[in-house]
Amino acid sequence: RINVFMEHLNNYLQNQGYENTILYDPSGYDVNALTTVSDLKSVSTHLLEKQWFRDIVSKSNYTATLPDGSTQTWRNTNTFLDQTSEYYNENVKGIKTGSLSNDYNLVVLYQQHGKEFLICSLGSQSDSSRYDDVNYILKTIDESDYLTK
C-alpha cells in the first residue's frame, strides 16, 4: 500500500510542477529522496500564499486540535525561532529544517524593511553550521544597498 501511495504522490508532485522531486517514504526520511532548490522554492512560495501556513511555521511551538477534540503540540526545530537560542532572530519567520545522514538543510523566510527573502541552505556540515551559513546570508542582506532602495 505504501508503494502505491508513494507512486501516486510522486505523480501528483510531477503534475504540480515539482519535476525534480522524488520521495520514497511518506516520512521524507529516506536518503534516496531527491529534490532541488528550485522545487523547494516553488513549494515554499506556494505555501506562503496561505496565511495559516505562515502562522504555523513562524511559531516555535504549534498546538493543533484534532478531530476527536484532543490536541497535539509540535516543537519547531528551527532555532532561529527559539527566543532562548543564540541563533534567535525576530526577522526569521520559519520555514523548515531537515537533515539526512550528514547533510543539514534549512529553508528560511526572512523579513527585513518590508521585503521578504526566501533562503534555501542545503548540505551544511552540522546542525549549528546550517544556522551559521544562513546567518552569513542574512548579514549580507542586511549590509547590502538593496534594503535602502
Task: Describe these PLM feature segments.
Residues 1-149:
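Penicillin-recognizing serine hydrolase domain
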